[in-house]
Curated annotation (Swiss-Prot):
Family: Belongs to the histone H4 family.
Protein name as annotated: Histone H4
Species for this entry: Apis mellifera
Function description: Core component of nucleosome. Nucleosomes wrap and compact DNA into chromatin, limiting DNA accessibility to the cellular machineries which require DNA as a template. Histones thereby play a central role in transcription regulation, DNA repair, DNA replication and chromosomal stability. DNA accessibility is regulated via a complex set of post-translational modifications of histones, also called histone code, and nucleosome remodeling.
GO terms under cellular component: nucleosome; nucleus
Subunit structure: The nucleosome is a histone octamer containing two molecules each of H2A, H2B, H3 and H4 assembled in one H3-H4 heterotetramer and two H2A-H2B heterodimers. The octamer wraps approximately 147 bp of DNA.
Residue segments, region Disordered: 1-20
Compartment(s): Nucleus; Chromosome
Length: 103
């Protein structure tokens, strides 16, 4: 291993991607039926039409916060892969302890 650091296999240079997929507004991937199913699980019978966009917005903010904290843990330990434990710790510091994923 000559100067590749920890973990790297040294295959390729990782140059410019020729066909990079353009990431659009992925929050729309959280579909109306998916939101309805989550609401049903929470015991909701009827749902206002305005709820769907509001739910997408709240979910986006929540995930941004969790992912930011998880990536902070990953960078601190000098890794490039976010593990399940990083997410568990990120949720724990937000006061939402998650069981069943190790630790």
């Amino acid at each position: 291993m000559t100067g590749r650091g920890k973990g790297g296999k040294g295959l390729g240079k990782g140059g410019a991607k020729r066909h990079r997929k353009v990431l659009g507004d992925n929050i729309q991937g959280i579909t109306k039926p998916a939101i309805r199913r989550l609401a049903r699980r929470g015991g909701v019978k009827r749902i206002s039409g305005l709820i769907y966009e509001e739910t997408r917005g709240v979910l986006k903010v929540f995930l941004e916060n969790v992912i930011r904290d998880a990536v902070t843990y990953t960078e601190h330990t000098k890794r490039k892969t976010v593990t399940a434990m990083d997410v568990v710790y990120a949720l724990k510091i937000q006061g939402r302890t998650l069981y069943g994923f190790g630790g």
